[in-house]
Amino acid sequence: MLAGQAPPGAAGCGRLLAAALRPLLCGLSPCWVAGRQCRGLRVAEAATEEAQVVQREKRGGVPVRRYIACPRLARTVQQCLQRGAGPQPLLLEFAPGPGILTQTLLNAGIRVVALESNLAYLPNLQSLENSLDGQLKVIYGDFCRLDPLVTGTLKPPAVCSEKLFETMGVAAVPWRADVPLRIFGIMPHTLERNRLWRLLFGLYECNSIYKYGRVELNLFISEKEYMVLRAKPGETWAYQPLTVLAQIGCEIELLHKVSVLYQLIWPNAMDWLPNDHLCLVRLTPQQNLFTGGLKPTNATTFIFMVKQCLAKPTSRLTLEIPENAAMRDLYPEDYRRLFEALQNSSTFTETWFYDEVLETVRTINL
């Protein structure tokens, strides 16, 4: 659905909700350190290489990406990612850049797959890979172009999840099993909301990375998007469909927060950066997500229902519900209970969702 536009059938949706809701709802500052030596990584040389890459990107008009440039921050992130002292699941790090965090993870004994789309960084990463005995695997690819919605042969750095997981040696496990893979990365500022939506669609439909189980995401995202993910009912601007779906689908944990993550930026970078905070957030899919009436086969319908309900978040609800209750006042679990009630009802069918909307909902806002 396009932002600011009510989806078709909103009036019918309101009548449907009124009938269905009656029985349901009564009741530190990172720094760039050059010259500090780490085993297997020449930080000063990495800094020089990073500066050269940034200059090439500036000349070519390509947006400069953000990387972890501070060894102290890298150690903090490593501690956030490492749970306990026992064996750790494989970790996929996308867009590692100069590899400062990569080296820190390796030093901690974590097995890492580095997925890098910038050819300028591959030689250093591959050199590090060759110096180790299988602890690091380097793959050319772009996580943000994983399983693109196109037909035909993919052109690198676009990558297919099936090929990626085969290369990593990660097999599919049952949904309620332990986490088979952890992923870390910094979400690009451009199209950040769209990328989060794509991940949520994959989660609910058990597609892409989620075909292999409850893959854990550890992402640096903007503080604005984190506030949306953790919003509470009634919060005017923050409580959105993304909020409801993320809170139902995932356990959301704030691991760390930094004021500035990327130091080598354009002179006018502050003109387009939305704020100066990034939040490291862990998104772990819920084990009990697909219990009751919610299943991967009807999850798209559920997503659209939530978007439909919150298209006009101030719409009033009636019928044995408090007078001032509005769509944005319902808790995420209320939406799930409503959907499950509709699924179990012989009165309502999915025809009111409109076939054309179901066909396009995967790509709108993605």
Model features per residue range: what roles?
Residues 2-304, 337-354, 359-366:
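Catalytic cores of RNA-modifying enzymes
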Residues 216, 307, 325:
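Short, flexible active-site loop motifs that bind/organize anionic cofactors or intermediates
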Residues 297-322:
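Long, well-ordered amphipathic alpha-helical subdomains in the mid-to-C-terminal portions
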Residues 318-340:
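RNA substrate-recognition surfaces in RNA-acting enzymes
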